[in-house]
Amino acid sequence: MAAEGKAIAKVNDLVIFVPYVVPGDVVDLQIKRKKNKYAEAEAVKFHELSPVRAVPFCQHYGVCGGCKWQVLPYSEQIRYKQKQVEDNLRRIGKIELPEISPILGSAKTEFYRNKLEFTFSNKRWLTNDEVRQDVKYDQMNAVGFHIPGAFDKVLAIEKCWLQDDISNRIRNAVRDYAYEHDYSFINLRTQEGMLRNMIIRTSSTGELMVIVICKITEDHEMELFKQLLQFIADSFPEITSLLYIINNKCNDTINDLDVHVFKGKDHMFEEMEGLRFKVGPKSFYQTNSDQAYNLYKIAREFAGLTGKELVYDLYTGTGTIANFVSRQARQVIGIEYVPEAIEDAKVNAEINEIKNALFYAGDMKDMLTQEFINQHGRPDVIITDPPRAGMHQDVVDVILFAEPKRIVYVSCNPATQARDLQLLDGKYKVKAVQPVDMFPHTHHVENVVLLELR
């Protein structure tokens, strides 16, 4: 399996990437795109199924863009993810490595996400079976997920296996009410229509947040919208935060928009080892809560804290890792690009009465400078959790200048992590590697690496 989650075939030395098949399948392929060194294809006929192939559990498999590895047993999924980490570190990093620990699989492989976002659209995607029936469908509104490669089309979802089933019940109830009362769904090309998006968040504390996003251009639409919200509140009393956002823009981003409370609170909490983390409608929080806890425990263990260390937490987000390790450190300094996330980090520190954590907002390469190090002190430990693109060269250079005793590198992209490890290799030796599976049935994998100063 390739890093993108596709299977690999070879024909006359041409490498071909094929989605929705597994090693051992015997298929006829149709080339869809050909480059100099590789091609992309789709399977048009199966002659023989692989002995390791599993039966997909989701009725939307193969059309929905998510959970593409359902056709692999979970034991095979994590085996390929382990290999993906090992291949990237060795092929790209080209550095000396210790024995790589077996991947930490997810105890939950279904209903493991704490957040899903659904899209409304008046352009329902018709499946191949529906198209072949050659029937004119009266109901072309849909609520579900975008179809890959067709931004204005949405696949109507009946059941999603990623989030607790309350999510399915809420989505389907809202859909049916909107159908029955003739609510307009957004046209993603013309931007006409009322209902846009719905975000559902659950938490380890049992709280439930629903955010409904709509476009309102006339007064009577607001009254209709509030009737829908009242229906949701009456139908699902377990909702602790029912919020709404008016989005009259031409895109779905909500970070610059006001959030209104229809019922309950404007936030909920996640808990971890007695720490409480405030999660708002716009907050970032790892979407697999159980595995996030395991990931943070690994990072803390690798950091080897004794209570005397100054720790820098780079790309701190809402400060979850920083606050999580603060009780074992002398001081923690978190840096993050998004100002709103830093405000959340400060609030979380205050909620948990953490006095030894400082947070700064700004672009990492501009914030983490030699002057910053000289002003705040050389860190004993750096924990870094960058985005998929990895760390900027300037950030790597300042880390090398700071010379912390240990670096804990948390990554959602082992390829860019391997590149960065090679840049650090002159001064640092990799001492431990621990892959973690945060997203079962996808090709994505997290990896935690401990480096020590040579």
What do the PLM-derived regions correspond to, one by one?
Residues 1-60, 358, 365-366:
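Terminal RNA-binding accessory module
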Residues 101-108, 188, 195-197, 435-438:
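Short, solvent-exposed loop/turn elements at beta->coil junctions and helix N-caps
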